[in-house]
From Swiss-Prot:
Superkingdom of the organism of origin: Eukaryota
MF GO annotations: structural constituent of ribosome
InterPro entries: Ribosomal_bS16, Ribosomal_bS16_dom_sf
GO cellular component terms, A-Z: chloroplast; ribonucleoprotein complex; ribosome
Keywords: Chloroplast, Plastid, Ribonucleoprotein, Ribosomal protein
NCBIfam families to which the protein is assigned, alphabetical: S16
One GO biological process term: translation
Subcellular location(s) per record: Plastid, Chloroplast
The name this protein goes by in its record: Small ribosomal subunit protein bS16c
Main localization (coarse): plastid
Pfam annotation, one family: Ribosomal_S16
Family statement: Belongs to the bacterial ribosomal protein bS16 family.
Amino acid sequence: MVKLRPKQCGRKQRTYRIVAIESQSRQEGKVIKEVEFYNPRREETQLDILAITTLCGSGVKLTETVCNIFRRATFKIT
């Protein structure tokens, strides 16, 4: 099963990339597609809405953390 989940970047000042990745692989595992950049310190997000909608249409599941990030970015998923 493929999921959208955050992948950590940086050591001291953490930022995250929201990636499509196999659910059983490690957090640093092979990425299928990167769809978002999220910086929690600045509350900054960069979305690739077309990629997100196509992935969700193909059956990709969202983790709870990613749903919360999308809500904060005022992006609704049906």
